[in-house]
Swiss-Prot record:
Keywords: Heme, Hydrogen peroxide, Iron, Metal-binding, Oxidoreductase, Peroxidase, Peroxisome
Pfam families: Catalase (PF00199), Catalase-rel (PF06628)
GO molecular function: catalase activity; heme binding; metal ion binding
Organism taxonomic ancestry: Eukaryota, Fungi, Dikarya, Ascomycota, Saccharomycotina
Catalytic activity, as annotated: 2 H2O2 = O2 + 2 H2O
Protein name: Peroxisomal catalase
SMART domains: Catalase
Binding site for heme: 336
Subcellular location(s) of the protein: Peroxisome matrix
Family: Belongs to the catalase family.
């Protein structure tokens, strides 16, 4: 039986396109609620887009534990090999707006919500293992340089490179970005990385520093700069189309999940800080350990309801998983939930895609607010009332905690020559793959050729610190693309 067409209060509407007016040619009547209702709702269809990661695609799936890591983490969804947990993953570009191209040279967001028996766990990752900053106060400044010039409203190569070359801790991520890894062939064919260091603990009270890797079972495939640019013009929704059509056809993408771990003692001996988001952990010294696999096997039924309204936050954790003292991660614990309250409202966790699978959110003092639609805990007192017993569930705590000593002090994590070491190692690794060093130099030169000459000179100097050969290649092509008088 077909549904009956109604207005917003459920009244049946016999003719949706008829309007009330005076005679055949007179003015419209304000009493025509069907028209006013329709226009008023249309005027409010759009909500604020994400300030970063605005353009995205999503799908549901399942995570399965493949290997026992209970010696590292006692989270319940990991307690049994073969145990399955429903998930929702959202992929995205970072800097572009909602209508931007999927193939832009940009990091890709890789956020996954695990609907566990102990609440929702959000793993809010990227497709690169490092990032541009390690000082959180730099984030708004950095993002502004990757977006539009406030005067011209155009992307601006001078802004882009001025920031990066004066904040040299960015160089490792910039090397990744301007390699062909910066233009993935699809969301299916890229990895995901925690980037940040987290703390996981077991039932013995022991804790570990952890890095997480999602390795694509489809392999890594990339686009050249020219292929990405061509697709941006011919099919800007290329990655969305690829993901949706493959899942619809039963070609379900999957990722195998690994961790790297460090003890506190190992972290103290490491040649870099485990809280430095611009560094990777060498696999030879801190080996990968498999723990699971997830598969995306279900497309959303409604993009706005399930993808646009999906809300992830690294503050959404479960027992035995917690953030480290990484300062950028610490700042994200606040900013992600804050932007969701701005975009979606204070009750954003009541939106179905964001609801815990248990449905058991019980916090008597968190009540009311715009769009509270879950019953608002009925007549239960809006505080912890002594005559209304509440269970406070206990779980094992870490016996050995981190200890911090010191006065409150301003700290700026300034760049040093050591920040070029891993970038130089990456440059040497690229030599093992055909044309990858040349592609990196070409991609940088094409982008930087749009900048003014003084900025170009800084770009050349920046990459020369990585390796003289890289600086020479970039200089040669920049001068060919933008000859100087």
């Amino acid at each position: 039986m077909a549904p009956t067409f109604t207005n917003s209060n459920g009244q049946p509407i016999p003719e949706p396109f008829a309007t009330q007016r005076v005679g055949q040619h007179g003015p419209l009547l304000l009493q025509d609620f069907n028209l006013i209702d329709s226009l008023a709702h249309f005027d409010r269809e759009r909500i604020p887009e994400r300030v970063v990661h605005a353009k995205g695609s999503g799908a549901y799936g399942v995570f399965e534990v493949t290997d026992d890591i209970t010696d590292v983490c006692a989270a319940k969804f990991l307690d049994t090999v073969g145990k399955k947990t429903r998930i929702f993953t959202r992929f995205s570009t970072v800097g572009g707006e909602l209508g931007s191209a999927d193939t832009a040279r940009d990091p890709r967001g890789f956020a996954t919500k695990f609907y566990t028996e102990e609440g929702n766990l959000d793993l809010v990752y990227n497709n690169t293992p490092v990032f541009f900053i390690r000082d959180p106060s730099k984030f708004p400044h950095f993002i502004h340089t990757q977006k539009r010039n406030p005067e011209t409203h155009l992307k601006d190569a001078n802004m882009f490179w001025d920031y990066l070359t004066t904040n040299e801790e960015s160089v490792h991520q910039v090397m990744v970005l301007f390699s062909d890894r910066g233009t993935p062939a699809s969301y299916r064919e890229m990895n995901g990385y925690s980037g940040h260091t987290y703390k996981w603990s077991n039932n013995k009270g022991e804790w570990f520093y952890v890095q997480v890797h999602f390795i694509s079972d489809q392999g890594i495939k990339t686009l050249t700069n020219e292929e990405a640019g061509s697709l941006a013009g011919s099919n800007p929704d290329y990655a969305q189309e690829d993901l949706f059509k493959n899942i619809a056809a039963g070609n379900y993408p999957s990722w195998t999940c690994y961790i790297q771990t460090m003890t506190e003692a190992q972290a103290k001996e490491a040649e870099f800080s485990v809280f430095d988001l611009t560094k990777v952990w060498p696999h030879g010294k801190y080996p990968m350990r498999r723990f699971g696999k997830f598969t995306l096997n279900e497309n959303p039924k409604n993009y706005f309801a399930e993808v646009e309204q999906a809300a992830f936050s690294p503050a959404h954790t479960v027992p035995h998983m917690e953030p480290s003292a990484d300062p950028v991660l610490q700042s994200r614990l606040f900013s992600y939930a804050d932007t969701h309250r701005h975009r979606l409202g204070t009750n954003y966790t009541q939106i179905p895609v964001n609801c815990p699978v248990t449905g058991a959110v019980f916090n008597p003092h968190m009540r009311d607010g715009a769009m509270n639609v879950n019953g608002n805990l009925g007549n239960h007192p809006n505080y912890l009332a002594s005559d209304k017993p509440i269970e406070f569930k206990q779980f094992s705590l870490q016996e050995d905690q981190e200890v911090w000593h010191g006065a409150a002090t301003p700290f700026h994590w300034k760049a040093t020559p050591a920040d070029f070491k891993q970038a130089t190692e990456l440059w040497k690794v690229l030599k093992k793959y055909p044309n990858q060093q040349e592609h990196l130099a070409h991609n940088v030169a094409v982008h930087a050729s749009a900048a003014d000459a003084p900025i170009q000179d800084r770009v050349i100097a920046y990459f020369t610190k990585v390796h003289p050969d890289l600086g020479d290649l970039i200089k040669k092509e920049i001068l060919e693309l933008s000859p100087r008088k």
